[in-house]
Amino acid sequence: MYHRHSAPPPPGWSGGYPPRQQQWPPPQPYEYPPYPPQGPPPAHTFPPPAHRDYPSPYPTPPPHSPSPYQHPHHGHSQSWSVPAVPPRPPLEAQQFGNGAPSHYRFQYSACTGRRRALLIGINYIGQPNQLRGCINDVTNMSTFLHERYGYRREDMVILTDDQKNPLSIPTKANILRAMQWLVKDAQPNDSLFLHFSGHGGRTPDLDGDEEDGYDDVIYPVDYRVAGHIVDDEMHNIMVRPLRPGVRLTVIFDSCHSGTALDLPYVYSTQGILKEPNLAKEAAQDLFSAISSYGKGDLSGVAMTAIGFLKKAAKGDSARQRTVMTKTSPADVVMFSGSKDTQTSADTFQDGEARGALSWAFIKSLKQWPNQSYLQLLNSIRAQLDGKYTQKPQLSCSHPLDVNLLFVM
């Protein structure tokens, strides 16, 4: 089991919680009422599969390009060159367009205000589907945020399953409370950051907002008792309350995490807003059903058939429902480790286990700190290209000019 920390926190650092002698029992953790007690998990809760296994042999970072980093010119030119620093986000309110109500406006964040971070790493120590790199991910991310972006240690909440303090264990109740703490009293131009490294999965969609008929979920350390956390709930806690101009940057390094916050605007590596192609997806489903039948996997046939029928019946309406109900005037940007249908991988870098997306995100910004959103998406993918099947995703709560400078 890999359980090393490359940059341990300083003595006495408790990740933003009250001093250790005051932590338990807390009068009111995070300065808001405690989250309601969690009941037993719903019937469709299931253990995450044993994914994120190590590749063999362990991969090395992708080779460097000839120049520091080569990006295409904006526009349609096929020539490649090193670009100037991308423009910073505009400060005035922007129109949504793209199918949202005509009166909707959103505002980019200058990220000049207060900074606050919630970092969650779960190795599921002692459980059947134990991971090895998630706690290391959180340790490395906290150091990166502190050194490169000025996040103060006292403004970070760290939840990992190797801690002694009960408030710092990533249980479902602690995670939900910490998510509320993260966005509480956020003001325009504040910069909030959420990082989750652990198991993710899927569960049948109950409110009709998912094109594929499934909600994305994350698994707390006590998921067998308390159940998982659904993307709709995370959206309602962390996205819906935010004011215009508040930035929330999210890194989900988990399986099936493509739309883990239900952000309606998803972008391709060409900077194009993705629209669902139901005909193509239906054809893929049909091929999958035939393959499952040939392998004798009758459950796979059934699941694929259900997905095919749901897409055919409500795909377009789900897309419109998501755009109309999940947009936000705030500035929420998410990089996720894989598409909704993919798993994410652990890797081994710098002498320790790491999550592939967490490692690639930090490495890309250390090497090329002044990238646009589109360049960052492509440089993250370049780090993983040829070594993993997962395809990191970029999504946003509003239409995003992907050629603007990535700020945080």
UniProtKB/Swiss-Prot annotation:
Residues 24-49, 56-66 have a biased composition (Pro residues). Keywords: Apoptosis, Hydrolase, Protease, Thiol protease, Zymogen. One of its GO terms (biological process) is proteolysis. It holds the Pfam family Peptidase_C14. InterPro entries: Caspase-like_dom_sf, Metacaspase, Pept_C14_caspase. GO terms for molecular function: cysteine-type endopeptidase activity. The active site is at H199, C255. Belongs to the peptidase C14B family. This is Metacaspase-1B.
